[in-house]
Amino acid sequence: MISDTVIAILAVALVGSTVQAAPVDATATSTSGIIAVPISKSAAQLAREADPVVSLDWLKKTKAQAQYKHKQANARLHSKRATGASVLTDQGSESLWTGPITIGGQSFTVDWDTGSSDLWVPSSACSSAACNAHHKYTLTSTGKKQSGTFSISYGDGSSASGPVYKDNVVASGLQATSQVFGAVTSESSSFSSDPSDGISGLGWPALAQLSGTSYFWSLINQGTVTSPVFSFRLATTNSELYLGGINSAHYTGAITYTPVTQKAYWTIALGGVSVNGAAINPSVSSAIIDTGTTLVYGPTAGVAALYAKIPGSASMADTYGSDYQGYYTFPCSAVPTVALTFGGSSFSVPTSAFNLGTVSSGSKQCVGGIVGQGDGSWLVGDVFLQGVYSIYDVGNARVGFAKTV
């Protein structure tokens, strides 16, 4: 694939709103300042495109991260009971969609993640190799240290921790005043190669480990965004997070909305799953929509039923061992059309996203991007989201999908 410099549009409009405001289309804010910003793909993604063989180590790592991320957040959840578009960079095998923010006037790149609800970046007090590889936060005149500490762990054994601060956070001109965030002083060495400096969560407040609201919820509460809605276009080029509305330039046709069933993750009802037009039993009829997860994970039984409909498919565990339980291969010459149904509308997984690459050099078997894991909700990540324009409506507690362009 040819490497391009990507041009994305940032539209900024600082207009007061209430939580009940209706979603605002980007075309309604054409009087706002518009800035064209060039971004490029990461080295990791370019390397992956040049090599069609999927990394077996990456398969293990990405599954472990997805599994542990939601297990940890669920434990925390149970213990509790104007517009602006931010340009995103596809970080490919790093499993991240990153974009720029400033904290106290200092620039950072963060992973925008609908599957978590906290904001954290490295602190200048951190001297580890991982921290030194990234931008670090220094306390400013607008910042203030808070009581308590922040700590998070990941499925591959890595972790990050540090004190809590408040400072002004800005993305695409939209400022959240006195935003709470973690400033990491201890960070595992495995973070050294991460393309982002930290994470900005877009999940509901119930998921948060930090006390206080997340960045986008602060924008709503402070009357900064036009509408309590954000939306994503995720693609190999021109990816965008649109804060405070919907960008009609990135979708076509009608938007199908599905109500959120639990205000923690963006969890909605899954209406069905099909393979090459044939319906299968999904086993579980709920789905978590998560931009911070690369693949699509489903209940073991549901995913087994899916691949049973694909001639020539095989479980990777039979050949490569239990570390690859839940992964399947299929003939590269016949990439299936898999579709998920939400709100009565069917949306296909892009075949280019479903096909993760050949299982080994010269093999005619490719690895599928839908993986069996456990018996809980479907976890719908970027393999599906690259085929839709996704809308997250806080005010009406619903998720919308439309055909992306």
Curated annotation (Swiss-Prot):
Disulfide bonds join C126-C131, C332-C366. Its EC number is 3.4.23.-. It is found in: Secreted. Residues 97-402 form the Peptidase A1 domain. Residues 22-81 form a propeptide. Pfam families: Asp (PF00026). Optimum temperature is approximately 40 degrees Celsius. One of its GO terms (biological process) is proteolysis. The active site is at D113, D290. Inhibited by pepstatin A. Keywords: Aspartyl protease, Cleavage on pair of basic residues, Disulfide bond, Hydrolase, Protease, Secreted, Signal, Zymogen. GO terms for molecular function: aspartic-type endopeptidase activity. It comes from the Eukaryota. Its main location: secreted. Residues 1-21 form the signal peptide. One of its GO terms (cellular component) is extracellular region. Optimum pH is 4-6. It is an enzyme of class 3 (hydrolase). Possesses acidic protease activity. Hydrolyzes casein and azoalbumin in vitro. Belongs to the peptidase A1 family. This is Aspartic protease.
